[in-house]
Amino acid sequence: MWPLWLVASLLALSQALPFEQKGFWDFTLDDGLPMLNDEEASGAETTSGVPDLDALTPTYSAMCPFGCHCHLRVVQCSDLGLKAVPKEISPDTMLLDLQNNDISELRADDFKGLHHLYALVLVNNKISKIHEKAFSPLRKLQKLYISKNHLVEIPPNLPSSLVELRIHDNRIRKVPKGVFSGLRNMNCIEMGGNPLENSGFEPGAFDGLKLNYLRISEAKLTGIPKDLPETLNELHLDHNKIQAIELEDLLRYSKLYRLGLGHNQIRMIENGSLSFLPTLRELHLDNNKLSRVPSGLPDLKLLQVVYLHTNNITKVGVNDFCPVGFGVKRAYYNGISLFNNPVPYWEVQPATFRCVTDRLAIQFGNYKK
């Protein structure tokens, strides 16, 4: 019988999309569980699968770096003050945890022989230099977590087997064309917390990628980046400096289920902009500078959650959220947040929320000048 901690770790690594995981590994930022877990979204989940637990048989190898904990095919070397990747790592290792150390460089032979490595965790080190051949031996690597380091560029020659890349909280200012070439299996990139501006994305930077999830939060974006993958189901651009959403900004993202634009400076959403998102279910526009409810919400038949709190909205019309007359909405709202807006909620007509599942799903009040 496999130890519970190992099974839980493997399942978390293999199935979790890019939201907060707490416990043994701290890989991510600050969101909840992915919404893409129902029948219509099942196709958006990662296709990487779970590692074959039957293959994790004890090897009883004496190879274990000094100070590390090695069990089955998991090597944990976190929080040891390491200056470099340790030697004597068993070649059959599948999970290698090197987070919270002082590693500053990845050399050409650091991962030599680790052909079975599935997940590599390098979070919270001081890595600023990566040799172009450092990842060459990692033929089966699917998860690379290299957030909270000192990188100024996306690492070269990433393994073609890679499914998930977490590279947030570094110093990256540019995403050049071709940097992701050959990564046909990639479906998740987390690159928030880098000083990226719109001009930092070269045309064709994401060519060839079929991403389900992309987060570029806490950057320096002033608009929605152009030419992101059309396959996206989730796009998170929160905590930027975006000021407006223009008609063509969302034209190519018809497969979005969740769009995160909270904590920006958005004052204007051009009429018709949201009409290109027929499958949208969750829309985050909280903590912006909107003066009215965006037009087009009643036409989004699958929309269930809208965050509009902490804006400058002064009025809510009776047809701002729900279709008129016999208009069909396939999924009723289960969450509309309007609190911390100067809306006289006692003047809002009850029929405004005729397509909401429960009155408790509507959040008003708590506005302070």
From Swiss-Prot:
Keywords: Disulfide bond, Extracellular matrix, Glycoprotein, Leucine-rich repeat, Proteoglycan, Repeat, Secreted, Signal. Residues 1-16 form the signal peptide. It is found in: Secreted, Extracellular space, Extracellular matrix. Disulfide bonds join C64-C70, C68-C77, C322-C355. Glycans are attached at S42, S48, N271, N312. One of its GO terms (cellular component) is extracellular space. It holds the Pfam family LRR_8. Its main location: secreted. Residues 17-37 form a propeptide. LRR repeats lie at residues 83-103, 104-127, 128-151, 152-172, 173-196, 197-221, 222-242, 243-266, 267-290, 291-313, 314-343, 344-369. PANTHER family: AGAP008170-PA, BIGLYCAN. Homodimer. Forms a ternary complex with MFAP2 and ELN. Belongs to the small leucine-rich proteoglycan (SLRP) family. SLRP class I subfamily. May be involved in collagen fiber assembly. This is Biglycan. The lineage of its organism: Eukaryota, Metazoa, Chordata, Craniata, Vertebrata. The gene is BGN.
